[in-house]
């Protein structure tokens, strides 16, 4: 995909959304239930869409919230329902709609007091704290967020009582019922006016923020960061964590400069992403251009996306740290710095993450759990302590408390940012330097991800390939040692293909939102070998789809 001439530059006025137009479209546009693009569709992070495309409108949220209430009843979930939102313009609208439906269904609602924002990890933690030691009246929740997606988008993400992203059984149930309701015009959905919902006996306000902040000492060595006197910076990218960082400063005596405290639903302060869109992606050097420009003023800087489940780490030596590099550093450090963690607890990684992680885990004598893409696969293990760290190459991760018990079962960009500061404080090396030291022991892998065009039919075939569809016996001059369509760690379908050789691998997966597929590839040799891997990967995928 060609790089936009606007990439990395301040967003021009022409790119800014009109929040009033979004609100009108949200309430007045009626989706077409016969159009798949306008139906409720749960991906790896809930239902997403835009009022402007007829894919995230009031009708969708009425249907989804009602379906969720019915799912709770079917599953015997009778405890409180925690609901939070990020800073996207549509999020507050969808949250209000959901409150009207939840209250009408008699669900016990718990919402952040003072109409404040709620990061995904704070909500996950709140669910787990409520459910600790309980066997009945278990809590669940929703975060209204499209994550780092553009300002015109909305999202609705369900977290069951395990606190993590819902599994496909739950999302499939809710999606099917929501679309039934959508087709019938939501006639069977229950709903009361917002004012009545907020006066109802089952509506409660609670502070999620300070309990989360005060509990951080049990997952991060905050005293080490304070004692080191590190000069730190954070850019919340206008997201839900924006009002968490000053309390973290004051509670722990840290020196974190919140360089951009603005909240603006147009996200006019952002620099433009690679494709010419505004996107609050903390892993993109283009979206992170403003913070990168400040890298030499601080010993370490970091950012989160709008629901704070992702992280971006900026160091003076490397600039924006490659997500795979930081995952490797975090895992290596934690396996040496958390002696109370169970020795048999696994490190969870998705199969498109770097194989450098495999080598670090093997050298530590620990178990690797390689899963399909999606943080939901790590949630059960994080909950019971059988997984001590779970991470995705898309900059989402979480890990256990220092005592080896659960912290969150959803991604937590705040603790990954603070972990970078802990690593710097306790080792004297910022994460960029730490990674390059690791390469002297484990080698220097070369990794890339590219997009390739695909029709909807080709995407569907790619998602259902069998290993037999790959006829090639070699890749980039080496014998193929594995052809995978199911993940080694849990034998779940990967929704694509992974091909492995001694010194390289590639994986191909269809995009969930665009007519393209993604190729991930890594070489243990050099960039030329990587280029050959990618070229042959495209040939193998094309031949497999034809067959």
List the model feature ranges, each with a label.
Residues 13, 20, 77-153, 247-312:
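N-terminal small/polar loop signature for handling phosphorylated ligands or for N-terminal nucleophile
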Residues 65-81, 221-228, 295:
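Glycine-rich phosphate/diphosphate-binding loops that line cofactor/substrate pockets in enzymes
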Residues 112-117, 176-207, 315-391, 396-399:
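Proline/glycine-rich low-complexity loops and linkers
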Residues 50-51, 80-86, 231-234, 314, ...:
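Short glycine-rich or small-residue beta-strand-to-loop segments that form or flank ligand, phosphate
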Residues 300, 337-520, 526-547:
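Phosphate-binding and adjacent anionic-ligand microenvironments
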Residues 2-38, 134-135, 152-294:
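Gly/Ser/Thr-enriched, mixed-charge loops and adjacent short helices
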Residues 37-56, 146-149, 236-247, 306-308, ...:
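Conserved phosphate/anionic-ligand binding catalytic regions in large, soluble enzymes, centered on
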């Amino acid at each position: 995909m060609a790089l936009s001439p606007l990439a990395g530059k301040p967003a021009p006025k022409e790119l800014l959304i009109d929040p009033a137009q979004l609100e009108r479209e949200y309430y007045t546009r009626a989706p077409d239930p016969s159009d798949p693009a306008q139906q409720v569709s749960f991906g790896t992070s809930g239902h997403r869409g835009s009022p402007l495309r007829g894919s995230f409108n009031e009708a969708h949220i009425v249907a989804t919230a009602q379906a969720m209430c019915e799912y709770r009843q079917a599953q015997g979930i009778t405890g409180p329902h925690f609901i939070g939102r990020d800073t996207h313009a549509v999020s507050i609208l969808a949250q209000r709609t959901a409150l009207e439906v939840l209250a009408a269904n008699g669900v016990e609602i718990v919402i952040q007091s003072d109409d404040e924002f709620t990061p995904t990890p704070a909500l996950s933690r709140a669910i787990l704290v409520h459910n600790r030691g309980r066997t009945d009246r278990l809590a669940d929740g929703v975060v209204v967020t499209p994550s780092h997606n553009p300002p015109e988008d909305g999202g609705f993400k369900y977290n069951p009582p395990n606190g993590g992203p819902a599994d496909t059984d739950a999302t499939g149930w809710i999606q099917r019922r929501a679309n039934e309701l959508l087709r019938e015009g939501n006639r069977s959905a229950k709903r009361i006016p917002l004012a009545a919902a907020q006066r109802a006996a089952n509506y409660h306000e609670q502070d999620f923020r300070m309990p989360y902040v005060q509990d951080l000492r049990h997952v991060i060595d905050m005293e080490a960061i304070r004692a080191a006197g590190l000069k730190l910076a954070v850019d919340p990218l206008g997201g839900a964590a924006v009002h968490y960082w000053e309390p973290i400063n004051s509670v722990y005596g840290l020196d974190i400069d919140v360089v951009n405290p603005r909240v603006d639903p147009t996200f006019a302060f952002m620099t433009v992403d690679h494709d010419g869109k505004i996107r609050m992606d903390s892993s993109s050097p283009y979206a992170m251009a403003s913070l990168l420009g400040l890298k030499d003023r601080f010993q370490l800087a970091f950012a989160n996306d709008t629901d704070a489940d992702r992280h971006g780490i900026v160091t003076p030596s490397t600039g924006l740290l490659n997500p795979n590099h930081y995952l490797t550093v975090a895992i290596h450090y934690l396996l040496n710095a958390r002696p109370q963690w169970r020795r048999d607890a696994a490190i969870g990684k998705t199969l498109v993450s770097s194989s450098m992680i495999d080598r670090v885990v093997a050298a530590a004598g620990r178990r690797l759990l390689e899963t399909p893409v999606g943080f939901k696969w790590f949630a059960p293990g994080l909950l019971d302590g059988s997984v001590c760290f779970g991470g995705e190459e898309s900059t989402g991760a979480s890990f256990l408390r220092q005592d080896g018990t659960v912290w969150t079962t959803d991604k937590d960009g705040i603790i990954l940012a603070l972990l970078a500061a802990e690593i710097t404080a306790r080792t004297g090396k910022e994460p960029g330097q730490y990674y390059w030291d690791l390469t002297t022991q484990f080698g220097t892998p070369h990794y890339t991800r590219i997009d390739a065009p695909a029709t909807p039919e080709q995407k569907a075939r790619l998602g259902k390939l069998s290993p037999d569809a790959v006829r090639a016996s070699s890749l980039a001059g080496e014998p193929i040692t594995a052809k995978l369509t199911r993940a080694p760690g849990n034998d779940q379908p990967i929704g694509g293909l992974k091909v492995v050789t001694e010194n390289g691998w590639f994986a191909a997966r269809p995009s969930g939102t665009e007519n393209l597929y993604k190729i991930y590839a890594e070489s243990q040799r050099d960039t030329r070998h990587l280029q050959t891997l990618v070229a042959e990967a495209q040939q193998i995928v094309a031949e497999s789809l034809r067959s």
